[in-house]
A protein has these predicted regions:
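Class I S-adenosyl-L-methionine
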Residues: 1-115
């Protein structure tokens, strides 16, 4: 596995409202250009970019894990991957850990995932 300098920030959400993200993650979203979102809630998350953000966003609607992994591997700069709840408990976390080094990944489970 070749390690890259860019980070993949995996953000678990429990709401489609941008304002429900902690301020740290709102800032991360503002600063990151490339965003991957599951196809099932792509339009809701894409609407976050209408919040007077300075940086234009490039969104990727992931329809399959294979397609998503290929897209993530092609990215040269930091990316955000939106998931539901806690991505390490169930979902995409395991697949990411099989394809990327731990140093490339940062996980931010949703607040309700701690309950």
């Amino acid at each position: 596995m070749t390690e890259k300098k860019r980070k993949i920030h995996v953000i678990g959400i429990n709401s489609y409202n941008f304002e429900d993200l902690p301020p740290k993650l709102q800032n991360l979203f503002r600063e990151t250009v490339s965003i991957a979102v599951p196809n099932s809630y792509f339009e809701k998350i894409k609407s976050w970019s209408q919040n007077n953000l300075e940086k234009k966003k490039s969104f990727f609607a992931s329809k399959s894990n294979h397609e998503l992994i290929n897209w993530l591997k092609s990215q040269k700069s930091d990316v955000i991957l939106i998931s539901r709840g806690d991505p390490l408990w169930f979902g995409i976390g395991r697949i990411l850990l099989e394809n990327f080094s731990k140093d490339e990944l940062s996980f931010y489970p949703s607040n309700t995932a701690f309950n």
